[in-house]
Amino acid sequence: MSKSIVLVLGLLVLVSCSKLTDEQLWNQGVDEQKAEKVQEALQSYQQLLDNYPKSPKVPDALYAIGSICQSKNMDVPRAIRSYRRIVDEYPTHATSSSAMFLIGFLYNNELKNLDSARVAYEEFLKKYPDNPMAASARFELDNLGKNPDEIIDLKTKPLAKGSGKAPARTIKK
C-alpha cells in the first residue's frame, strides 16, 4: 500500500514539474506550425487555452487555431468559432478586426452561408469603418452570391459613359 502511495505522489510531482507555461505552449505551437505539424500545433494552442484561460496569449492562440483550421480547410466551423471568440472576448486585440473580416469571408466563400456572411461583413463595417480591409468588406458585400467569373467580368468590362452599363460589343470584319 505504501509503495502505491509513493508511486502516486512521485507521478504527481513529475506531472506538476513538467507542466509547460503559457509562453512555452505558445512557442511550442509556433514551432510545430512552422514544421507543418498541424495537429500537434493545434494541441499546443488548445492546451494553452485550457490551462491558461487568462493568459495574454489566448487571443493569439485563438487566431492561430482559426488560421490553421482555415488554411488547411480542416474545420471551417472551428475557425469561425475561434475568430468569434476573439471578436467577442478581446475586441481591442490587434487581431480582432482581421478575425471579424475572416468570419464573413469564411461564411461567404467556404460555407456559402450568404446571410451569415452579410451579418459578419456589416458588423465589420460598423465596428471598423476606417480599417484598411473595409473596402474589401464592401466589395464582398456587393458581390455576395456571385461566382468568381461574374466578378471578373464585372471588373474587366468597361462601362459605357454615364450609363452604368457595359457597352454592346461589336465585331469588326
Can you describe what each PLM-predicted range is?
Residues 2-8:
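Sec-dependent signal peptide recognition
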Residues 5, 14-173:
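Acidic, polar-rich low-complexity tracts and alpha-helical solenoid repeat scaffolds
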